[in-house]
Design a protein with these regions (language model features):
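Core catalytic region of metal-dependent phosphoesterases/phosphodiesterases
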Residues: 2-5, 9, 14-109
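Generic alpha-helical secondary structure signal
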Residues: 23, 58-61, 65, 130, ...
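Charged/polar, solvent-exposed surface patches and flexible loops
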Residues: 27, 69, 90, 94, ...
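Short, catalytically relevant binding-site loops at active-site mouths
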Residues: 46, 85-86, 121-123, 202
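N-terminal short leaders/motifs
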Residues: 47-70, 150, 162-173, 190-195
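Conserved beta-sheet core of the metallophosphoesterase superfamily
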Residues: 99-102, 113-115, 120, 126-131, ...
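Acidic, His- and aromatic-enriched active-site or binding-groove loops in soluble protein domains
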Residues: 108-109, 114, 141
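Active-site-proximal loop/helix segment associated with metal-binding centers of metalloenzymes
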Residues: 119-179
Length: 202
């Protein structure tokens, strides 16, 4: 790992409606082709992802080939699920040659034991969010969702996003942030010296 340049990103929330952001990311990948890089994407690369079979999604035809070109030239790619794109699956992983990381995940960074996470599971003060997170991450919920048609999944995803935005209006920033005591406990539980996470956009 010492010969690799490690890059950590999260929460790009790429969306078909925000082409500028997507193009910046694609230029970043292009500029690093052939370099000795390990790119870690710690969740929410996409603003939403309803399944690997949604091939009509413009981001699929733009981002997946770019990631494949990136990894084909020697770069490494590790992807962690976020709260918006936890349905990224084995097909996406195979097409992009990405390693799907469990959350949390321990790595050694130049001798420092480091915990990687998207981070949303540490927002424990937001009880409503944690209940929803537990539901949608269950195998039963995901299997049922993936049985729906593409159109039905898009509509449900839109409804969930609208409800989420409405819910945020009635919550303080502190409630939606990670709980410091929960993060402190993660340091102890995983015996690590550093934590790198996303989700909170701070």
């Amino acid at each position: 790992m010492s010969n690799l340049k490690l890059i950590f990103i999260s929460d790009l929330h790429l969306s078909p409606s925000e082409t500028l952001k997507t193009n910046i990311f694609l230029r970043f990948l292009k500029s690093n082709i052939g370099r000795s890089i390990h790119l870690f994407i710690l969740g929410d690369l996409f603003d939403y992802w309803i399944g690997d079979d949604d091939r009509a999604n413009p981001l699929f035809s733009m981002v997946v080939p770019a990631l494949r070109e990136f990894t084909n030239t020697g770069a490494r790619l590790s992807v962690m699920h976020g709260n918006r794109d936890f349905l990224i699956g084995k097909s996406f992983s195979g097409l992009t040659r990405a390693q799907l990381l469990p959350d949390p995940f321990i790595i050694d960074i130049y001798g420092n034991r480091t915990l990687l996470s998207h981070g949303d599971q540490w927002c424990t003060d937001d009880i409503e969010y944690q209940a929803i997170r537990s539901m949608v991450r269950s195998d039963e919920w995901m299997n049922n969702f993936l049985r729906l048609t593409i159109t039905e999944r898009h509509q449900q995803a839109k409804n969930y996003r609208q409800k989420s935005e409405t819910s945020k209006e009635n919550k303080t920033t502190e409630i939606m942030d990670v709980s410091l005591s929960t993060v402190d406990q993660a340091f102890v539980t995983h015996d690590c010296h550093r934590i790198i996470h996303g989700h909170t956009h701070r």
